[in-house]
Curated annotation (Swiss-Prot):
Pfam family, one: LETM1_RBD
Subcellular location: Mitochondrion inner membrane
InterPro entries noted in UniProt: LETM1-like_RBD, LETM1/MDM38-like
UniProt GO molecular function: mitochondrial ribosome binding
Annotated Letm1 RBD domain residues: 182-404
Gene Ontology cellular-component annotations: mitochondrial inner membrane; mitochondrion
Domain notes for this protein: The matrix-exposed C-terminus contains a 14-3-3-like domain which is necessary and sufficient for interaction with mitochondrial ribosomes.
Descriptive protein name: Mitochondrial distribution and morphology protein 38
Stretches assigned to coiled coil: 408-440, 503-541
Disruption phenotype: Leads to the absence of respiratory complexes III and IV in mitochondrial inner membrane when MBA1 is also missing.
Length: 573
């Protein structure tokens, strides 16, 4: 019964399908009927096709689904721009750039007149004037392509070879983005290279500083840094790191870096590594000098006064990651830089080298060896505190991987500063002793003068009294007066001889002192001349930029503009 029912159902289904095919047009029949049965099509005979068996799986654990062809819901691809459209866009871009350049020249002329009249320009106005002057000077070689006939045909090739030939107003957004991506890649590569080279250099071991006694603070820090206990991670406070970092001068660190390290550092600072080692050092020094001056102006005007683009440029020039970073993070990074540079007096070279370790920003899970006791007391640490710990950790990594020459130079500087302080104290003591010895003969000379004055007073009183007395024996008195006069005459040359001897001694002592001073000065001049000859033989590029701030200049930084007094008093005559 089951087979009959299933067979009947199959017949009815087949008849229905044949009926559907029969009632369709010849197009459908030709497409559904094989070619071997086409002769029967004219007679209206339709062949009976056996239906294929269908098997269904009884396993319900796996659901077999046929792949469905994806429906194309994506937007249609944009057609490529034609040559005329590209030319129109280029002409419009250069027209807008020309208008912008003219407007900047107009504004910069007013700023130049303001500066010529003696007014002080702000940081934004100074950058505007500098950028416009650079664009105007770039127009000089660019004008040659406009003056020379048919030279504009070679302009695309010239721009390909020299991309900075055009002023900054003609730079497109794609070019800016390409420069940013290239700068990020270069900084990543150079930071990795600096890490490897600093780690491969000869580090300081415990044996090299074991016998030192005078530089306790300096050597204890490195002893703690390189002799970590087993199972414990040594931590350092911010005060310890800043105190040791201040001992490494900018010039001493730069002078002892190798050629590959200088080239990588110049690339990291967006400088071209062209020339010998002295030229690279000169370029890095001049760039750092500009950054140091810019730090003071930003600190005075306030970080909040900068726009988004100005914050981006300031962070990029200092080696920070700025692309894709929010404005709040840029402000925090710049505040941390100013705190370490101006308040803590950390050298700029160490700051740039530490930025190679902190280029990626704050990691998600970080453990810092540097901590601040003030920040630890807070319940919730701010992002500023985390960034401060990150930068101190970067400085600590730079100090832990400093080569031997830099360490030895810093160690000598510390010992020389201590020995010079001891020498100055000894010189002061010797000078005080000389002053005391000079004061003693003056004190002894004062009683002699007083005694002679008393004798003269007594003699005058005696001469005044003698006329009143009764003279009995005039001869005896005259004899006594003659004897007294002779004694006085004999006493006067002795006193004059003693005075001349004392004066000769004083003059001889002064002359000897002056001669000694002149001899010392001549020796110092000879040493300086020898050192100058050695420097002239070594160095070919004059480098007179000194990045180390003087001790006298280590005063309180200027008061920011927002904290300054809003009123002032003018004294009237």
């Amino acid at each position: 019964m089951l087979n009959f029912a299933s067979r009947a159902s199959c017949v009815t289904r087949r008849q229905a399908s044949l009926y559907f095919v029969k009632n369709q047009g010849p197009r459908l029949i030709a497409s559904t009927i094989p070619s071997c049965h086409w002769p029967l099509r004219a007679q209206g005979v339709q062949p009976n096709y056996p239906l294929s068996l269908r098997f269904y799986s009884t396993d319900k654990s796996k659901s077999v689904t046929k792949p469905v062809a994806p429906t194309s819901t994506d937007a249609p691809a944009k057609p490529k721009e034609t040559l005329m459209v590209k030319v129109k866009h280029a002409l419009k871009h250069y027209a807008n750039g020309t208008k912008l350049l003219g407007y900047e020249i107009k504004v910069s002329t007013k700023l130049l007149i303001k500066f010529a009249q003696g007014y002080e320009l702000s940081r934004r106005e100074r950058n505007q004037l500098r950028r416009t002057m650079g664009d105007v000077f770039r127009l000089i070689p660019f004008s040659a392509f406009l003056i020379i006939p048919f030279a504009e045909l070679f302009l695309p090739f010239a721009l390909k070879l020299f991309p900075n030939l055009l002023p900054s107003t003609y730079e497109s957004g794609k070019d800016k983005q390409a420069k940013r991506n290239k700068l990020i890649e270069i900084r990543k590569k150079t930071s990795e290279f600096l890490h490897e080279t600093l780690e491969e250099s000869n580090l300081i071991t415990y044996n090299t500083i074991e016998n030192a006694e005078k530089k306790q603070k300096f050597l204890n820090f490195f002893r703690k840094l390189y002799s970590a206990k087993e199972g414990k991670i040594m931590t350092f406070q911010h005060d310890e790191i800043s105190a040791i970092a201040q001992m490494f001068k900018n010039d001493s660190v730069l002078d002892n870096l190798s050629r590959p390290q200088l080239a990588a550092m110049s690339k990291f600072m967006s400088l071209r590594p062209f020339g010998n080692d002295n030229m690279l050092r000169y370029q890095i020094r001049s760039k750092l000098k500009d950054i140091m001056n810019d730090d003071k102006t930003i600190d005075y005007e306030g970080v909040e006064s900068l726009s988004q683009e100005e914050l981006y440029q300031a962070c990029v020039s200092r080696g920070m990651k700025a692309y894709g970073v929010s404005k709040e993070d840029l402000v925090d990074n710049l505040k941390v830089w100013l705190e370490l540079r101006l308040r803590q007096k950390i050298p700029s070279v160490l700051m740039v080298l530490s930025s190679t370790f902190t280029f990626g920003g704050l990691p998600k899970e970080n453990y810092s060896k540097a901590f601040s006791p003030l920040a630890e007391k807070k319940e919730t640490k701010s992002k500023y505190d985390d960034l401060l710990d990150l930068y101190y950790d970067g400085i600590l990594q730079v100090l832990s991987s400093i080569p031997d020459p830099v360490y030895n130079v810093a160690k000598l500087d510390v010992s020389e500063s201590k020995s010079s302080a001891a020498e100055t104290e000894a010189e002061k003591q010797v000078a005080e002793k000389k002053i005391k010895t000079e004061e003693k003969p003056e004190e002894t000379a004062i009683p002699k003068e007083e005694a002679t004055a008393k004798e003269s007073v007594i003699a005058t009183t005696a001469s005044a009294v003698t006329p009143k007395l009764v003279v009995v024996n005039e001869k005896a008195e005259t004899a006594k007066t003659e004897e007294i006069s002779q004694e006085k005459e004999n006493a006067e040359p002795t006193d004059s001889a003693e005075a001349t001897e004392a004066e000769e001694k004083k003059t001889s002592d002064d002359n000897e002192f002056k001669l000694n001073v002149l001899k010392e000065q001549e020796e110092l001049i000879k040493k300086e001349e020898e050192e100058a000859k050695q420097r002239a033989s070594r160095e070919h590029v004059p480098d007179d930029i000194n990045l180390d701030e003087e001790e006298e200049a280590k005063s309180v930084p200027p008061i920011p503009a927002d904290q300054a007094a809003k009123t002032f008093v003018i004294k009237k005559d």
